[in-house]
Amino acid sequence: MSSFGQTYFISIFAGEIRTTFDLSHGDWGAIYGFGTFASAIAMVWAGGLTDIMRVRRLGPIVLAALAASCLFMAFNPWVALLPVVIFCLRFSGQGMSTHIAAVGMSRWFAANRGKALSVANLGFSIGEATYPLLVVALMMLFVWQGIWVLAAFIAVLSIPALVWLLREERSPESMATEDQSVGMNGRHWTRNQTLAHPLFWFMMPAFVGQSAFNTAFFFLQVHFSEIKGWDHFQLVAMFPIYTGVAIGSMILSGVLLDKIGTARLIPYFQLPMIFAFLLFAYGQSLLAALLGFVLLGLTSGATATLPNAFWAENFGTKHLGSIKATAAAAMVLGSAIGPALTGVLLDFGLPLEAQYVGVSVFFGASSLLMWVGVSRARNSTPT
């Protein structure tokens, strides 16, 4: 259900939204960035609710909010309210929906945490593979606002299914006393202690950057297809391949981290992004774009498991909700920065291809920082 608040879904409507509200690339990017930034701030507080509320109670509230947000997008006639619409979608969809799933699985599964996170993220991957093609096809038949009404209906239908599936859910309180997993130095770290540790800050550029520029790429998918001279449908037709690679990478990374831990994997998981964005920058054929999607999928799949397991493995599970809420807020902030930055740079005349060269350089630097941070903390990490 988080798909309705994800960039890959919202950005499909970018052309229609810009036309309806008479927005430039920079205007739309700024509005999207502002709404996403506000949701990042809200996540710092709301994310901690997973430490005190059961998913069975919190989940339906979030899904109801997501359904209302979809209706808000469908019926909002004023550009002044568009940042509020984006905030609601991003907070309830990208923010809380994914956060609840990741924290629940990270807390409930210790020995098989990687596999559990892989399974939890299959829903996201399925949505990423199917919704873009479906929505582009539906937009040929219906007005775009009607598709958002359909999204709201789907979100409402998912509420009773969630309640039924979690009818015997374990509570955060029971997990705090029975199945704790400690972090570095054999202890449970609080949010403030985590923020004071250098490892957190060595990892942040990579986590924020991946969110920022992956979001920016899908946010500008319509513009990207235009400058390459491709039909938009040709581009979204590659999404299932991207998603298939991401699913394979997600499962493989989940299995590997259960066997060897995150420390040996996480410094290298963004290396494919370097070459993906170089292909997007310089490639002019659909084949080059397809190879770029394959490389992008390798990192996106690993992102579904490695960062979530990283927080639990290094800082323990007792305060995982609040710790991951902070990290999630930072990543949501990144997803606000990416579209806003690329949109403004486009308005100032910097071509998207040139921006993607800079993005590839960024991922090289962030991978180096991760390697340094993990190497410094290795002796403190539980085995």
What are these regions (language model features)?
Residues F124-R170:
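Helix-loop-helix hairpin linking two adjacent transmembrane segments in secondary transporters
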